[in-house]
Amino acid sequence: MATRTGQERVGSELRTTAGWPLTTIVLIHLVISLVHGAAHTGARVSLTPAGAMFVYIVILAGPLAGLGLSRWRPQPGAWLVACSMAGALVFGLINHFIIAGADHVGHVAAAWRSLFGVTAALLIVAEAAGTVIGVRQATRRARRTS
Protein backbone atom coordinates (compact mmCIF):
# COMPACT_ATOMS: atom_id res chain seq x y z
CA MET A 1 0.00 0.00 0.00
CA ALA A 2 1.42 3.38 -1.00
CA THR A 3 1.34 6.41 1.29
CA ARG A 4 1.53 10.11 0.50
CA THR A 5 5.09 10.43 1.78
CA GLY A 6 6.68 8.26 -0.91
CA GLN A 7 6.65 5.15 1.23
CA GLU A 8 4.84 1.86 0.97
CA ARG A 9 3.99 -0.70 3.60
CA VAL A 10 5.10 -4.25 2.78
CA GLY A 11 3.81 -6.44 5.56
CA SER A 12 4.93 -4.71 8.75
CA GLU A 13 7.87 -3.00 7.01
CA LEU A 14 7.71 0.57 5.70
CA ARG A 15 9.87 1.00 2.57
CA THR A 16 10.79 4.16 0.69
CA THR A 17 9.52 4.23 -2.90
CA ALA A 18 11.16 7.54 -3.83
CA GLY A 19 14.38 5.72 -4.81
CA TRP A 20 13.29 4.80 -8.35
CA PRO A 21 15.18 7.71 -10.00
CA LEU A 22 18.37 6.57 -8.27
CA THR A 23 17.82 2.96 -9.33
CA THR A 24 17.05 3.98 -12.90
CA ILE A 25 20.13 6.17 -13.38
CA VAL A 26 22.46 3.60 -11.79
CA LEU A 27 21.18 0.87 -14.11
CA ILE A 28 21.33 3.12 -17.19
CA HIS A 29 24.89 4.07 -16.23
CA LEU A 30 25.84 0.41 -15.84
CA VAL A 31 24.52 -0.49 -19.31
CA ILE A 32 26.30 2.46 -20.96
CA SER A 33 29.50 1.57 -19.07
CA LEU A 34 29.39 -2.02 -20.31
CA VAL A 35 28.88 -0.92 -23.92
CA HIS A 36 31.68 1.65 -23.53
CA GLY A 37 33.91 -1.10 -22.11
CA ALA A 38 33.19 -3.20 -25.20
CA ALA A 39 34.22 -0.23 -27.36
CA HIS A 40 37.45 0.04 -25.34
CA THR A 41 38.15 -3.64 -25.98
CA GLY A 42 37.27 -3.46 -29.68
CA ALA A 43 39.40 -0.37 -30.22
CA ARG A 44 42.22 -1.92 -28.17
CA VAL A 45 42.30 1.06 -25.81
CA SER A 46 43.70 -0.26 -22.57
CA LEU A 47 43.89 1.56 -19.26
CA THR A 48 46.78 1.83 -16.86
CA PRO A 49 46.48 -0.45 -13.81
CA ALA A 50 45.49 2.59 -11.72
CA GLY A 51 42.91 3.64 -14.33
CA ALA A 52 41.47 0.12 -14.47
CA MET A 53 41.21 -0.02 -10.66
CA PHE A 54 39.41 3.35 -10.68
CA VAL A 55 36.98 2.09 -13.32
CA TYR A 56 36.19 -1.13 -11.46
CA ILE A 57 35.97 0.37 -7.96
CA VAL A 58 34.56 3.88 -8.46
CA ILE A 59 32.77 3.80 -11.82
CA LEU A 60 31.29 0.28 -11.81
CA ALA A 61 31.12 -0.90 -8.18
CA GLY A 62 30.56 2.48 -6.49
CA PRO A 63 27.10 3.28 -7.87
CA LEU A 64 25.94 -0.34 -7.43
CA ALA A 65 27.19 -0.42 -3.84
CA GLY A 66 25.48 2.90 -3.15
CA LEU A 67 22.25 1.62 -4.65
CA GLY A 68 22.42 -1.52 -2.50
CA LEU A 69 23.21 0.50 0.62
CA SER A 70 20.34 2.89 -0.11
CA ARG A 71 17.85 0.09 0.51
CA TRP A 72 18.76 -0.01 4.21
CA ARG A 73 20.54 3.31 4.68
CA PRO A 74 18.99 5.69 2.12
CA GLN A 75 21.02 8.81 2.88
CA PRO A 76 24.53 7.26 2.92
CA GLY A 77 23.60 5.13 -0.10
CA ALA A 78 22.51 8.16 -2.09
CA TRP A 79 25.69 10.01 -1.09
CA LEU A 80 27.80 7.04 -2.26
CA VAL A 81 26.01 7.08 -5.63
CA ALA A 82 26.48 10.86 -5.92
CA CYS A 83 30.18 10.77 -5.03
CA SER A 84 31.02 7.81 -7.25
CA MET A 85 29.12 9.34 -10.18
CA ALA A 86 30.91 12.68 -9.63
CA GLY A 87 34.27 10.89 -9.59
CA ALA A 88 33.34 9.00 -12.76
CA LEU A 89 32.25 12.26 -14.41
CA VAL A 90 35.59 13.95 -13.72
CA PHE A 91 37.54 10.85 -14.83
CA GLY A 92 35.56 10.60 -18.08
CA LEU A 93 35.77 14.29 -18.91
CA ILE A 94 39.52 14.37 -18.39
CA ASN A 95 40.38 11.09 -20.12
CA HIS A 96 37.90 11.18 -23.00
CA PHE A 97 37.75 14.88 -23.84
CA ILE A 98 40.66 16.83 -22.32
CA ILE A 99 43.91 14.84 -22.18
CA ALA A 100 45.24 13.88 -25.61
CA GLY A 101 45.91 10.16 -25.29
CA ALA A 102 44.73 6.74 -26.41
CA ASP A 103 41.53 7.17 -24.34
CA HIS A 104 40.60 10.49 -26.01
CA VAL A 105 37.57 10.24 -28.31
CA GLY A 106 39.50 11.81 -31.16
CA HIS A 107 42.34 9.28 -31.01
CA VAL A 108 40.37 6.03 -31.08
CA ALA A 109 40.60 3.75 -34.13
CA ALA A 110 38.18 4.94 -36.82
CA ALA A 111 36.17 1.71 -36.82
CA TRP A 112 35.30 2.19 -33.13
CA ARG A 113 35.29 5.99 -32.91
CA SER A 114 31.51 6.46 -33.24
CA LEU A 115 30.53 3.91 -30.59
CA PHE A 116 33.35 5.04 -28.31
CA GLY A 117 32.46 8.72 -28.69
CA VAL A 118 28.71 8.26 -28.30
CA THR A 119 29.06 6.11 -25.19
CA ALA A 120 31.64 8.51 -23.71
CA ALA A 121 29.18 11.38 -24.20
CA LEU A 122 26.27 9.34 -22.81
CA LEU A 123 28.38 8.50 -19.76
CA ILE A 124 28.94 12.22 -19.13
CA VAL A 125 25.17 12.79 -19.22
CA ALA A 126 24.39 9.76 -17.03
CA GLU A 127 27.11 10.62 -14.51
CA ALA A 128 25.99 14.24 -14.24
CA ALA A 129 22.39 13.06 -13.77
CA GLY A 130 23.50 10.45 -11.23
CA THR A 131 25.38 13.07 -9.26
CA VAL A 132 22.38 15.41 -9.17
CA ILE A 133 19.87 12.65 -8.37
CA GLY A 134 22.12 11.24 -5.64
CA VAL A 135 22.58 14.64 -3.98
CA ARG A 136 18.85 15.39 -4.20
CA GLN A 137 17.90 12.02 -2.72
CA ALA A 138 20.48 12.36 0.07
CA THR A 139 19.54 15.92 1.01
CA ARG A 140 15.81 15.24 0.74
CA ARG A 141 16.19 12.38 3.19
CA ALA A 142 18.38 14.53 5.45
CA ARG A 143 15.73 17.27 5.56
CA ARG A 144 13.02 14.74 6.43
CA THR A 145 15.03 13.32 9.33
CA SER A 146 16.02 16.70 10.84
Feature-to-residue mapping (PLM):
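Alpha-helical transmembrane segments in multipass membrane proteins, preferentially the mid-helix core
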Residues: A61-S70, V132-V135
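Individual transmembrane alpha-helices with interfacial aromatic-anchor signatures
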Residues: A109-A129
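C-terminal TM-helix exit segments that contain a strictly Trp-centered aromatic cap at the helix terminus
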Residues: V31-H40, C83-A102
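Transmembrane alpha-helix entry/boundary detector in multi-pass membrane proteins
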Residues: G19, H36-G62
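Membrane-helix boundary connector in multi-pass membrane proteins
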Residues: N95-F116
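Juxtamembrane transmembrane-helix termini
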Residues: A39-P49, I98-V105, I133-S146
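Cytosolic juxtamembrane helix and N-cap/initiation of the first transmembrane helix
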Residues: M1-H29, I133-A142
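Loop-to-transmembrane helix junctions at the membrane interface
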Residues: L67-L93
